[in-house]
Structures are given as structure tokens and as C-alpha cells.
UniProtKB/Swiss-Prot annotation:
It is a single-pass membrane protein. Its main location: membrane. Belongs to the peroxin-11 family. This is Peroxisomal membrane protein 11B. Involved in peroxisomal proliferation. May regulate peroxisome division by recruiting the dynamin-related GTPase DNM1L to the peroxisomal membrane. Promotes membrane protrusion and elongation on the peroxisomal surface. GO terms for molecular function: identical protein binding; protein homodimerization activity. One of its GO terms (cellular component) is membrane. The keyword Transferase does not apply. Residues 159-176 have a biased composition (Gly residues). The keyword Signal does not apply. It is linked to Peroxisome biogenesis disorder 14B: An autosomal recessive peroxisome biogenesis disorder characterized clinically by mild intellectual disability, congenital cataracts, progressive hearing loss, and polyneuropathy. Additionally, recurrent migraine-like episodes following mental stress or physical exertion, not a common feature in peroxisome disorders, are observed. Keywords: Acetylation, Membrane, Peroxisome, Peroxisome biogenesis, Peroxisome biogenesis disorder, Transmembrane, Transmembrane helix.
Length: 259
């Protein structure tokens, strides 16, 4: 099992390069169609995209074992929310890869009787569940970091003898006796929360990259399952951006969100 997991990890870079090329073809095909390119050229781009997709499925053979090993490690995390989100995400990834392997067998002719549409829908459902868990984990980590940053700011303000913006010390908007002060106070709180969120994400590049990558990937299963039709152009662009970010995490491992 360990030997297969190591072999699977070595093929990740090739798979992600193929993924980037596949979604680049999808984006290019959409652009060619919009600009009235020749049908023959559009057909060649679609065929190249199909070949890259089949090649990716071959490179992903056995990735279920890697996902299961990751799920086994995540079970031992001390934080219960992270443990749940990461474990469920890896289990859904394992099921997604298993469905993907069945699809590869059908498309390669090894199992011609496979209902490819049914298995494709199953794989995208598991993919969607995995992404939802990933984004839930990201949201949880962001909340924790924002609370830590807010507490640190409060301690610094108290240490320097400063007042809290909008509080009674400043006599600012939003006091109980201020007519119509509720709306400006709410706007101020929202602005402070947005600034705090931006500060947290700027200070934690791995978390920022993970949020953007998962958000981009989310459009793919939503479109394929018919939950939100966004078109091949958006799918191609989001897939390409996500693939480039994934490649960056391989080139620079410190950009990968841990655990």
C-alpha cells in the first residue's frame, strides 16, 4: 500500500499538468466557437481535450488508496471540526476516484457495458461533497484566525491605552441615544470584518490559495450535475486557474494548507 501511495504521489505533477492543458483546451474551444473558427479546428481541440481527460484518468488509477491513507491520518486530528471535515473530504475523494476508475475502464474499452453517464454523475456528486467539506474547513480556519487576530488587536489597544472604534470612548456613531445610528454602526462593523478577513488571508497564503482553488473547482461539478449551468468558458477558466494553483503547491510545498 505504501509503495503504491508513493508511486501515486509521483504522478501528481503529470496529472495536474494534464489537467491544466485539458481546461485550457476547454477555454480555447469556447473562445474559438465564439469567434467563428472553422469546425475542423474546433473538432481537433475537442478531441485533444478528450484525450487529455482520458490520460488524466489513467494517471489517477489507484488514487483512492492515497485518499484513504489521508483519511486514516485525519482521523487522529485533535480538533473535532477539522477531523470531521478533512476525513469526510478524503473519503468522498476516494469514492470519486473509484468512480473515475470505472469510467476509465468504460472509455478505454475494458468494460464497454459501463453506463458512463451514470458513473460520471456519481463521480461528480462525490467530487462536489468533497469540495463542500474543503470549503467548510477553510471557513472554520478563517473564523479561528479572525478570532485570534481580533483578540490580539484588542490586547494591543488595551496595552496602548486606546479606545475601541465606535465605542462609548469615541462617542462615535451607533450609540444607543444616536437616532438612526444602527445602520452606520452595522456598516462600520462590516467594513472592519472585511478588513480583518483581508488581513488574515494576506497573512496566510496557503489558506488563501486553498479557498480560491476550492471555489474555482466548485463550478465544475455544479455545471456537470446541472445544478448551476455556467457554460464551458467559465468551467474552462476556473479549471485552469485551479490547476495552476495546484501546480504552485507542488512547486512550493509551503503553499499547501496543512494538515
Amino acid at each position: 500500500m505504501d509503495a503504491w501511495v508513493r508511486f501515486s504521489a509521483q504522478s501528481q505533477a503529470r496529472e495536474r499538468l494534464c489537467r491544466a492543458a485539458q481546461y485550457a483546451c476547454s477555454l480555447l474551444g469556447h473562445a474559438l466557437q465564439r469567434h467563428g473558427a472553422s469546425p475542423e479546428l474546433q473538432k481537433q481541440i475537442r478531441q485533444l481535450e478528450s484525450h487529455l481527460s482520458l490520460g488524466r484518468k489513467l494517471l489517477r488509477l489507484g488514487n483512492s488508496a492515497d485518499a484513504l491513507e489521508s483519511a486514516k491520518r485525519a482521523v487522529h486530528l485533535s480538533d473535532v471540526v477539522l477531523r470531521f471535515c478533512i476525513t469526510v473530504s478524503h473519503l468522498n475523494r476516494a469514492l470519486y476516484f473509484a468512480c473515475d476508475n470505472v469510467l476509465w475502464a468504460g472509455k478505454s474499452g475494458l468494460a464497454p457495458r459501463v453506463d458512463q453517464e451514470k458513473w460520471a454523475q456519481r463521480s461528480f456528486r462525490y467530487y462536489l461533497f468533497s469540495l463542500i467539506m474543503n470549503l467548510s474547513r477553510d471557513a472554520y480556519e478563517i473564523r479561528l484566525l479572525m478570532e485570534q487576530e481580533s483578540s490580539a488587536c484588542s490586547r494591543r489597544l488595551k496595552g496602548s491605552g486606546g479606545g475601541v472604534p465606535g465605542g462609548s470612548e469615541t462617542g462615535g456613531l451607533g450609540g444607543p441615544g444616536t437616532p438612526g445610528g444602527g445602520l452606520p454602526q452595522l456598516a462600520l462593523k462590516l467594513r472592519l470584518q472585511v478588513l480583518l478577513l483581508a488581513r488574515v488571508l494576506r497573512g496566510h497564503p496557503p489558506l488563501l490559495l486553498d479557498v480560491v482553488r476550492n471555489a474555482c473547482d466548485l463550478f465544475i461539478p455544479l455545471d456537470k450535475l446541472g445544478l448551476w449551468r455556467c457554460g464551458p468558458g467559465i468551467v474552462g477558466l476556473c479549471g485552469l486557474v485551479s490547476s495552476i494553483l495546484s501546480i504552485l503547491t507542488l512547486i512550493y510545498p509551503w503553499l499547501r494548507l496543512k494538515p
